[in-house]
Each structure stands twice: as C-alpha cells, then as structure tokens.
Amino acid sequence: MCAVFFAAFAGCKKGGSGEKVGISMPTQSLQRWNQDGANMKAQFEKAGFAVDLQYAGDNDIPTQVAQIENMIATGCKVIVIAAVDGSSLTEVLKTAKQKNIPVIAYDRLIMNSDAVSYYATFDNFKVGTIQGEFLKNALKLDSEKGPFNVELFTGSPDDNNINFFFGGAMSILKPYIDKKVLVVKSKQTSKAQCATQNWSTEEAQKRMENLITQNGYGPKGTKLHAVYSSNDSVAQGITNALVGAGYTKDNFPLITGQDCDKTSVINMLKGQQAMSIFKDTRTLAEQVVKMTSQIIKGEQVDVNDTKTYNNGVMVVPS
C-alpha cells in the first residue's frame, strides 16, 4: 500500500465581516467533495463569512445551475464553484458577471466563460507524474525488459484537469510504451479513449470488464501488470471488475489513484489498489478563503500562475 501526501498553498486571514459566500460542490457521493465542502465552510465561517454551501445532487448539472442562480439572487458576494461539467455554466455565470459577483473555480477549471475571476487548484500535472513514477518504479521499467501489459484510465472528458493528470502520467509512461517495454493491448492510449464520463465508478467498471474480455486478461489468461487510473472513483470501478474476473491479492495488477477515498484505502489494505495520492484540501480551502478576503477588501489577489489555465475564452489567474 502506498499513500502519497501532496499539499499545496497555505495561509489565510480574517476578513469576512459577515459577507455571504456561496460554495457550489458537484456531489456528496464521494468522500473527497464532502471533505472539501466541509473544510471550506468551516474556514470561511472562522474567517467571519456567512456561507451558503450547496451540493448538486449526484453530479446533476441543472441542480448546480439552479443553486448558483439562487446564490446570485440571495446576495452572495463571491461564489466558489467546483463544476459538475466545466462547460455547462457559461450562461448562469453571465448573470454573475453582470452583477459584479466574482467567481472562483475550485479545482476544476470552468471553461468557455469570461466570468471566472480566479482558479484555485493543485499542481495536477505533478499529480500525474507522481502516479506515472510510481508505476515506473514498481515495475522497474529502467532495469526490466518486460513487456508489461498496462491499460490506461483517466477522468471525465468535460473536466479540464484530465489534461494535466493524464498528461503528467503519460510524460513518464509514454517513452516506455514507445519502446514496447509497456504494452497497451487494447491500443487505447489517447485521452479521449481513456476518459471516464463523470469520473464514474460504474463506467470505469464497465470499460475494464470489456478490456478483460476483449484482451483475454485474467488470473489464468493474459497477465495484466498494471492499470493507470487518475483517481480513486475510477480505480474503484477497475478494482470491482478485476475482483469479478477472479483476481486476488496474490495476482492483483497495480492500480494508481488519488484522493485517498475511504473505499480505496480499504482496497489498498486488501491489496486491491497499489497507491493513492492524498491532496490536503484543507490547504486549498485556506487559499480560497485568503483570495476571497482579498477580493472583499479590494486588495490585490495573490496568484502564482497567469499563463497555464486557458479556459477557451481567457487565461484564468491561479
């Protein structure tokens, strides 16, 4: 079992003065988003803000849009959004901009909108490289000839983060694929082919089951050495499919992940997932509170990247 700790950002100061902040989270079905919402709410309230925290059902776009509309109508001074679908909020955010309400995209870049004021996130390319390095080292790719069979999974195609997770991992793994030390028997190596709609555990399980059938993987069939997965909800679907195919802890392929979701931690203890990256979202919440305080006070907002995150309309400061 390997849990990698990954922290970013720090520091916040008082400055709420009772101003109301809206927080829009995508779902309560994953432990990660429950923690993010609770962390932000607690830290905003500690800093003196009133908080309207809403979850969009189970990744329901109309629900999230309606909740944001309500936040705009009820006087939120800043709205923090982790989007269900990064491309679905263009129209509702036009209203926010018309009312001069700043919007902070939280760990998922909101696309195709000029109403996004700031983006708070981790170094997600680095997350991908850590996952790729783990597989490289675990399989001893620099010293063993292989070939090692691997399949690739990333997240939702409407989540800009997969460009960084998948890109980071492939920056490590692709040279070994090109040298045929790693072999992707399915030949599904593009981001589009490896995407998992809504980061769905069920969709990941279905795809993994199909890959097992189509490529003859199994404890008594073709050996599958590893499966790259960008996060834990996808990894859990992969694990479910492999368990269903008869794999045990003695022959389980290496599976990567991130978020250290409770189910994945249990799977790691069972030998059914090899690693997960823990991103300390408390530090990200601290940064969001700090940015919001600076916005409310009319101060310059601290950012450290004004080049990387192009949402199709503008580069969003991060």
Provide a role label for each language-model segment.
Residues 6-9:
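Bacterial Sec-type N-terminal signal peptides, specifically the leucine/valine-rich hydrophobic h-region
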Residues 12-318:
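A residue-level marker of the well-folded mature domains of exported/periplasmic proteins
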Residues 1-2:
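Sec-dependent N-terminal signal peptides
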